[in-house]
């Protein structure tokens, strides 16, 4: 996803995020401040995520997005950007190497959120004495 955060006339800095594996949610709804970039190939999406953040593409997006009174980009603007073919052996190899890492990062992010909920539930009870460590049964 490409999105704008803040900005003022003549000034546009795009931001990027990556999603998948249920992160941040299984279903999402977006508004006009978010541009969904899904190239229908997970490996190619990962390549595009990093490629879009290169100085060359960032300068292109800054230039395109900063021309309007309300900074931003549209579908036509993104479709005009140069990008390597998904058939390139280098792009395919990049996806093969990097995609497993991205999937692990996204999966770990979900696990971190679950663990934070458990911590936030248990810690106040432990601190107040409502729950004692020796009272907690553990699985063996």
Task: Provide a role label for each language-model segment.
Residues 1-53, 64-79:
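A short beta-sheet element
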Residues 42-43, 47, 58-60, 64-68, ...:
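Amphipathic alpha-helical coiled-coil/heptad-repeat segments
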């Amino acid at each position: 996803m490409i999105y704008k955060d803040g900005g003022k006339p003549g000034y546009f800095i795009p931001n990027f995020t990556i999603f998948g594996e249920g992160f941040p949610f299984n279903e999402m709804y977006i508004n006009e401040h978010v541009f969904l970039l899904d190239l229908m190939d997970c490996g190619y999406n990962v390549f595009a995520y990093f490629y879009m953040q290169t100085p060359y593409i960032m300068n292109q997006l800054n230039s395109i997005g900063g021309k309007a009174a309300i900074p931003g980009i549209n579908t036509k603007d993104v479709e005009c950007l140069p990008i390597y073919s998904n058939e390139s052996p280098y792009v395919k190899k990049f996806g093969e190497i990097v995609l497993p890492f991205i999937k692990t990062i996204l999966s770990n992010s979900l696990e971190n959120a679950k663990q934070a909920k458990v911590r936030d539930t248990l810690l106040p009870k432990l601190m107040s004495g409502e729950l004692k460590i020796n009272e907690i049964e553990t699985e063996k």
